[in-house]
Amino acid sequence: MNISRFILVRHGETAGNKDGLFYGSTDLPLTEHGHRQAACVAAYLQDIQIDTILISELQRTRQTAEYIRAPETHHYHCDPRLNEMHFGEWEMQHYSEIAARYPADWETWMNDWLHAAPTGGEPFPQFAARVQAVADELCGEASETPATRLIVAHKGVLGLIITRWFGLPAEAMWQFPCEQDSYSVAECRDGFMTLAVFNGRSCFTPVV
């Protein structure tokens, strides 16, 4: 049986997470707590062979990946399609500030976020399409070449990848909230995908 594994890791905490702000494309570093979270995930995955590492362009994913496997020993494949959604003029603002400054756009977003865009930001359909394209490519690679691939990305991105792999609509992404300081594992066995671990917080032992 051919088995491919995807280890999905959300980056550690940033100041934007800590302060409850809308942000995606803003390139924030990890907080001290975020560094500790990344170290915890690295410990959970220390005994797993990892063949390929994929990250976004944003430093918080690279900083997290560096705890899991050092760049001196593993090449990082940086894919801009794995970047978090760009929230335009809403970046680094609290929802209460956004509602006050952009009331019409905020109301549109709240009523139909699946088809709307933040002020000056990325429309959700465009965001979903680029992430789903990566998910499709990875699924095809998994069927052809068995390997263990680590993906360090963002909450929205990882949720969309999971829903794509399991044939769910994009809005189901919120049913798979990948948490910081944890990891998830999707396995492709002879072309059939399963979710083996979700938000795991203990050492991972693969089942052959």
Task: Show where each model-derived region lies.
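Acidic, low-complexity terminal tails and accessory targeting/binding regions
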Residues: 1-4, 77, 88-97, 144-147, ...
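Short, hydrophobic/glycine-enriched beta-strand segments
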Residues: 5-11, 151
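Loop-to-helix element that buttresses phosphate recognition and phosphoryl-transfer chemistry
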Residues: 13-68, 118-132
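Short active-site segment of divalent metal-dependent hydrolases/proteases
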Residues: 14, 157-158
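Phosphate-coordination/substrate-recognition cap region in phosphate-metabolizing enzymes
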Residues: 39-106
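Active-site catalytic microenvironments for nucleophilic, acid-base chemistry
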Residues: 44, 67-71, 137, 141, ...
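Glycine-rich phosphate-binding loop signature in dinucleotide/nucleotide-binding domains
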Residues: 47-49, 138-147
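Short basic (Lys/Arg) and small-residue
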Residues: 154
